[in-house]
Design a protein with these regions (language model features):
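Acidic helix N-cap motif at the loop->helix transition within catalytic regions
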Residues: 7-16, 55
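Glycine-rich, basic loop-to-helix element that forms the pyrophosphate-binding segment
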Residues: 12, 22-38
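Conserved donor NDP-sugar-binding/catalytic core segment of glycosyltransferases
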Residues: 54-81
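A recurrent flexible, glycine/aromatic-enriched loop bordering the glycosyltransferase active site
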Residues: 68-78, 87-108
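Acidic donor-binding loop at a coil-to-helix junction in glycosyltransferase catalytic cores
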Residues: 121-127
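Hydrophobic helical membrane-anchoring modules
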Residues: 129-187
Length: 187
């Protein structure tokens, strides 16, 4: 699924033999479209700049034998010590997971919570929070690696402050449309 990226990701995927479906609009629309087109009983939502670790498939299958869904821990593709541990700190202090953690779910649980809501921002946070309320959420001990481009481009402290502010405002009921203007996409 490609939500309208302009960085050549879709073309790279095509040249590697992948079927690329473009779903213009928000990431939530792309993930919903992907889930509708998927034929399996398990769904894994992987961002284009995130890499799964060895053994990911087996770990997901084992977790999903118990139903529900889950996610991986995250590390950033940056050698700076603080960024290497930021994923664990983010998880510990912010709680719910985000899309760069390769969220996975059974189709039954996906349908039970109504899938992704068509939000312009916080769609992964919202999805994972609702999934956790089903009582069947697994945080795997394996790490995915994701791009730290926003941290490199805007600075880590600025990025963290913006993320925490947006999450706090979202939890306080501020409209996702308004929040999206504060956190432009990096594609």
């Amino acid at each position: 699924m490609d939500a309208g990226s302009d960085d050549g990701t879709g073309e790279a995927a095509r040249s590697a033999g992948a079927r690329v479906i473009v779903a213009p609009g928000s990431r939530a629309v792309a993930m919903t479209t992907g889930a509708l087109l998927a034929r399996g009983d398990a769904l894994l939502f992987l961002h284009a700049d995130t890499t799964l670790p060895a053994g990911a498939g087996d770990a997901v299958r084992q977790a999903l034998e118990h139903g529900g869904g889950g996610a991986f821990r995250v590390r950033y593709d940056d050698g700076r010590p603080f960024l290497r541990t930021l994923g664990d700190l983010r998880l510990r202090f912010l709680g719910p997971v985000y899309g760069d953690q390769a969220i996975f779910v059974t189709r039954a649980a996906y349908d039970q919570i109504g899938g992704y809501r068509p939000l312009p921002i916080m769609e992964d946070y919202d999805f994972a929070r609702r999934l956790r309320h089903t009582g069947r959420f697994f945080l795997l001990p394996l790490y995915v690696e994701t791009a730290a481009r926003r941290h490199r481009g805007h600075g880590t402290l600025s990025t963290l402050a913006r993320m925490w502010t947006i999450q706090g405002l979202y939890r306080a009921g501020v409209s996702p449309d308004r929040l999206a203007r504060m956190y432009p996409p990096t594609r």
